[in-house]
Amino acid sequence: MIRIFFILLFFPLISFSQVNVKGTTKSKTENVFFANIIFKNANNTIFTTASNQNAEFTITLNPGVYQIKSSYIGYFDFVKEIKITSDTTLNILFEEETKQLSEVVVRAAPQKITEASVVRTVRNSSVVSDGLSIEFIKKTPDRNVGDALKRVNGVTIQNDKFVLVRGLSDRYNSAILNKTLLPSTEPDRRAFSFDIIPTALIDNIIVSKSSSANQPGDWSGGLVQITTKEVSDNFFNLSLGSGFGSVSTFRGFKIVPSTKFPSTFPSTHQYRISGNGDKRLFTKQFDNPLETTFQSTPNLNGGLSFGYTKGKFNSLFSSTIRNSFILNNIERKDYQSSTELAYNYKDILYTKRFSTNGLLNLTYLGENRYSWKTLVNYQTDDTYLTRSGDNFDNVQNVLSNSSNHINNVVINSQFDGKIKTWDFNLGYNFIFREQPDYRVNPITKSLGVNEPYTTAWRDTYRFWSVMDENSFNGNINKSFGNIKVGGGYLKKIRGFNARIFRYLSTDMLDEITNNTDRYTADFDLGSLYSMYENEWGKWKLNTGVRGEYNLFNVNTADFSGQKVNVNREYLDILPSLNVSFNENKTKYRFSISKTLARPEFREVANFAYYDFVRNAQLLGNSKLEKSDIYNLDLKWEFYPKTGENISFSLFGKNFIRPIEQIVADGSVPSNLLLTYTNPDRAILYGVEFEFRKKITEWFDMYSNASVMNSEVNVNGVK
């Protein structure tokens, strides 16, 4: 293994007898993406390539004289003859086609963001990937990225917002917005909530499924890469829309208004040492709103966007607003044994969701390229859940309810540039998540007894929490022909604090906040990589190695108040190899790589979070360690026509010390306690199939399917 690693590490330094031709495809005002380029030698042998999503191309040829022809819709063909004797840089400059009718000049604009361009990106990519364009998404009812990701091969969406790729939970997947790694939006899991990004603000989504050295190392299932809108023309759009749901529209809806935590309420210690009389006075500071019932209206959404270009400067502003109602009927059961029920519940979950956001992109397209992109999003979810049924474990009839409110603010801002063979990115992320007054009201009576329902006061629950996270990142990359090197740094700082109460009577609260219900955390990650990429005829090779150094610190406490500092220090070497063979319309791929999964702040903090919907508490584990993952991919792709493809994939993954959520020892279904652990090993393998066919200009046929199997051994149990 060590010998193989050093071969991979120094492979980029090997030289070959052929020469490399690289360059860009541009017009006078903008980059031209995915342009076709044909090289014909003296023997009339043809070699083809295409520029990528950065308007760059590279090809390996034998020395000689070549006729070059490059074309793209909306531009005159670029034709030139050159003599190639050594490594050569060829910058292709297109001239726009114009058709003059009297005094009107019509310019044909080059298409971007199309399904054909995404298929071409996937085809030309060095790694195994799948994707969607905004052209395709517009033909669906999808209004946010969470909805759209359901249509990507091998991707499943949980709770309408969390992504599972190839059967791996959200904690094994990562997300990038433009070029910035997105943080977790959740206090109780490592996950990004994709429903907060509207599809109206994006150009495309690419999901990488195999790794290369220039990608982050902390993922295994999929790396979701979201590209926000860019503009090349002046435009103004205003849209209004409405949606009707047979289950949720014009139905009786229930919501309990949220309440802010009183600003003059005493600290945990001061409240606990107060007498009962003072506690009753303090309790009166809390609003105690009752549920309100109203008739839901149709979902409403609106959008405003405009773009402005002048010379080499482009600007884009876009904003959307959406108000929606969701109603879910849920059956929830758990068993004490294979045949004996622990409980049998019927839930009705009402969700009222409001979101608004804004996107501002400023771009300069000269000899060098610079852009500043900022996305601001605010979303609030108000939920009310009613639960009825039987709890056989506690011998009770249940008629309970809970209300929850979640406010999310996400700010993503980044500045990036490309200067000749250098490119860089500076980014900032801010996540704010507030949970004001999560309430649980357990109402029960004895099972099978004719008696009134009563509130179980000691099991009531009122919860307030605030989480904020700031992250800063920077990356720089440099190309030396077919060799690319780079490095980056990421800093994350998080704070979390919660206050928890229960009722002792109708007019007095008991604070049950623990020392574990707050933590601070910071995370430092430095990375360096070296990558080699080249083509020889029908073969393409991408190989390299990435090194990541990570410092990880979580400051919390145990139940006694004793400080608990969780410190981790990791140095990881992550090699990768991607090989493809392209024959006419068919492409074969092979990929092998090492990646990893680091514990999230929440997973190692001692904080215990009660989830009434799942009927469970979730507790962190301060002894949790990172997981090493070895990945293997084989893929066959066929491209019959532009924008069409058929593909079949085989994949396998071997996890060393996987991070798994388990039921804690001694836990029972009626009082479920979940935590995290590192089993010795796990494996995952499966197959994927995708079919994409364009029937007419307005009608596409698209289908995909995945079958997978996973095995994990926890304490001797598979």
Predicted regions and their residues:
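Transmembrane beta-barrel wall of Gram-negative outer-membrane proteins
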Residues: Q285-L385, N408-V409, F415-K418, L577
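Surface-exposed extracellular loop regions of Gram-negative outer-membrane beta-barrel proteins
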Residues: T180-L181, F432-Y438, S446, N450, ...
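Periplasmic N-terminal accessory/gating domains of Gram-negative outer-membrane beta-barrel systems
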Residues: Q111, R120-L164, K179-I197, L201-A213, ...
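A short, solvent-exposed loop/turn motif at the edges and junctions
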Residues: K40-T45, K69-K80
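Signature of Gram-negative outer-membrane beta-barrel scaffolds
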Residues: D459-Y461, S465, G481-N584, Y609-D611, ...
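Short, acidic, small-residue-rich periplasmic hinge/interaction motif at the N-terminus
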Residues: K26, N36-K40, S71-I73, T89-E135, ...
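Outer membrane beta-barrel strand-and-loop segments of large Gram-negative receptors
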Residues: S471-K478, L509-S527, L619-N621, E625, ...
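Short, acidic Ser/Thr/Gly-rich low-complexity loop/linker segments typical of extracellular
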Residues: A42-E56
